[in-house]
């Protein structure tokens, strides 16, 4: 296997892209060598940005050793990421980078560079707003999940996706890390012993553990449609009008509602941070918090609406007129989604893994308060989800817990 470097990347591209023009100045940079805010990727794979006056490309190579941690990792992930992007682009070309070519022998693919857009997580950390983010992400999830489900595809194509995207090794990371490791992870003591004791007490609660096991069972056994499976705000790039989703190597046939909950959880963490981090004024804080809640509402409602439209227009003949089945699917999403949101925030909040959403808060007491609020919301939505009928019910829980928490300060 050829290992791509800054020294050999130009002849490599010329070999695989005959129209690649290096007669003009070419700028080559490795993604991950810059700041997180600039790149948001490059921890596992070797990713290069190649810019000429005519075009800008990104080359991604998956080796058997992770770039940063130097741990062994399956190289097939590069092939699965390319194929998932190809499928998602066919369904929602407006939300996925355009692919140029794939080199399976060397675990490489090349796509358009979308770095003119910004990594959403770090823009939210700076209180930047993306008015269309909820709608765009809701459309992306609903369309791609429906169009890769058995409700749309032939049985043969659906089974083919299940087999192709088995993704055993990377799925194991999520199955263990997100659903199990929070019970044995090193609690973050940097926020004080009282916080560590509080977080540990929550983590040891058998009721919460039972809920995580129930969600893990669905994550492992429900092959509803092709999901991204790592759709956090660092894997979304956006401007005021555009949005692109990247980094799809965890993709597999998983449950409806997982990606939705994963992203909602990231937005909840931003909300908790916004309750305590610095703003130019309290009016700015109020506006940003309102924006985050509106984005959560738009995300969920757009998903439900778009999935329904896809169903009404394109569901297979045998399911036409079965509104009860559609409503059952959407209700299950409404119940599962807050659980997955709780799960992802819980793990990131109690562990000592850096969490940029909270790390941006400079004052230690404010950071601790934001993290505690997040844990309390995680607890509340995990057990409150069974009665939720709409996004408004979830948002009501978030606001209610914040109000009660402030009374204790």
Locate predicted features.
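Conserved NTP-binding catalytic cores of kinases and kinase-like/nucleotidyltransferase enzymes
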Residues: 1-107, 240, 394-409
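Active-site activation/catalytic loop segments of kinase-like enzymes and analogous catalytic loops
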Residues: 83, 258-315, 341-359
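ATP/Mg2+ or Mg2+-diphosphate-binding catalytic cores
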Residues: 323-409
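Conserved ATP-binding subdomain of kinase catalytic cores across diverse folds
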Residues: 53-56, 61-168
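Short, flexible/disordered intra-domain loops and linkers
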Residues: 66-76, 275-289, 361-367
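A glycine-centered beta->alpha junction motif in the catalytic cores
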Residues: 62-67, 113-127, 146, 269, ...
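Active-site acidic catalytic loop and adjacent metal/ATP-binding pocket
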Residues: 36-52, 57-59, 210-258
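ATP-dependent phospho-/nucleotidyl transfer catalytic cores
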Residues: 121-140, 150-228
């Amino acid at each position: 296997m050829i290992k791509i470097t800054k020294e050999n990347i130009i002849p490599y591209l010329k070999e695989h892209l005959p129209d690649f023009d290096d007669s003009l100045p070419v700028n080559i940079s490795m993604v991950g060598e810059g700041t997180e805010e600039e790149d948001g990727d490059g921890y596992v794979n070797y990713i290069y940005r190649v810019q000429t006056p005519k075009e800008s490309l990104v080359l991604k190579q998956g080796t058997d050793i992770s770039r940063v941690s130097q741990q062994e990792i399956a190289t097939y992930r590069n092939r699965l990421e390319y194929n998932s992007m190809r499928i998602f682009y066919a369904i929602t070309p407006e939300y996925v980078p355009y692919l140029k070519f794939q080199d399976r022998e060397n675990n490489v693919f090349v796509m358009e560079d979308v770095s003119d857009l910004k990594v959403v997580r770090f823009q939210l950390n700076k209180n930047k707003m993306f008015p269309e983010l909820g709608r765009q992400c809701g459309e992306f999830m609903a369309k791609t999940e429906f169009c890769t489900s058995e409700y749309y595809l032939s049985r043969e194509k659906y089974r083919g996706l299940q087999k192709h995207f088995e993704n055993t090794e990377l799925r194991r990371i999520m199955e263990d890390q997100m659903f199990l490791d929070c019970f044995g992870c090193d609690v973050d003591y940097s926020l004080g012993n009282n916080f560590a004791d509080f977080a540990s007490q929550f983590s040891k609660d058998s009721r919460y553990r039972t809920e995580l096991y129930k969600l893990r069972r669905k994550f492992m056994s429900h092959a509803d449609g092709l999901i991204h499976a790592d759709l956090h705000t660092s894997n979304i790039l956006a401007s005021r009008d555009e949005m692109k989703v990247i980094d799809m190597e965890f993709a597999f046939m998983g449950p409806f509602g997982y990606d939705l909950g994963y992203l909602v959880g990231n937005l909840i963490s931003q909300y908790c941070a916004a309750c305590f981090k610095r703003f130019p004024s309290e009016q700015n804080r109020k506006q940003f918090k309102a924006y985050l809640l509106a984005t959560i509402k738009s995300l969920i409602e757009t998903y439900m609406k778009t999935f329904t439209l896809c169903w009404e227009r394109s569901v297979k003949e045998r399911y036409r007129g079965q509104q009860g089945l559609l409503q059952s699917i959407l209700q299950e999403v409404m119940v599962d989604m807050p659980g997955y949101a709780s799960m992802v925030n819980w793990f990131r909040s109690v562990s000592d893994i850096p969490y940029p959403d909270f790390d941006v808060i400079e004052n230690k007491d404010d950071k601790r308060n934001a993290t505690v609020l997040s844990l309390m919301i995680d607890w509340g939505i995990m057990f409150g989800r069974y009665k939720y009928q709409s996004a408004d019910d979830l948002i009501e829980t978030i606001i209610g817990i914040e109000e009660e928490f402030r009374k204790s300060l």
